[in-house]
């Protein structure tokens, strides 16, 4: 079984400006560095990318190699090695600009302890997502978009 944390934030900037930043892993990941550690591995022939991503879930790092697909207004990644996890970043229209939604799914092993760890991980991941979204919002609203 897996657990998913989903959080959203409204960014008071045009959708195309927000989507350009939020769906470019090379720009987004340094902005949300509080989520964990990220290292670019390479671009594949089909235009997708591989990254090593280790997410901070409490005192442990979960993650491994991921396959990243970026097509504005969405960015997704799926683990190909290491802890099973995935992420969806989606930018949608909002009357005040754009809404950025991040959904992180983590699957941990084990039966009873695995379920307990997933429940704890969902809360921690949710707080990291909120912090990352606020960093992104602040960068777009008050800093200069890259």
Language model features: what each stretch is:
Residues 2-10, 48-50, 61-63, 74, ...:
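Intrinsic-disorder/low-complexity, polar/charged segments enriched in Ser/Thr/Lys/Arg/Asp/Glu/Gln
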Residues 29-30, 39-83, 131-146:
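Glycine-rich portal/gate segments that line the openings of hydrophobic small-molecule binding cavities
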Residues 11, 55, 104-106:
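Hydrophobic beta-strand positions in extracellular immunoglobulin-like domains
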Residues 78-131:
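Beta-strand/loop substructures that line and gate deep hydrophobic ligand-binding cavities in soluble
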Residues 12-15, 43-46, 69-73, 90-99:
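A short, structured loop/turn motif at beta-sheet edges
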Residues 1-46, 146:
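Hydrophobic ligand-binding cavity/cleft-lining segments
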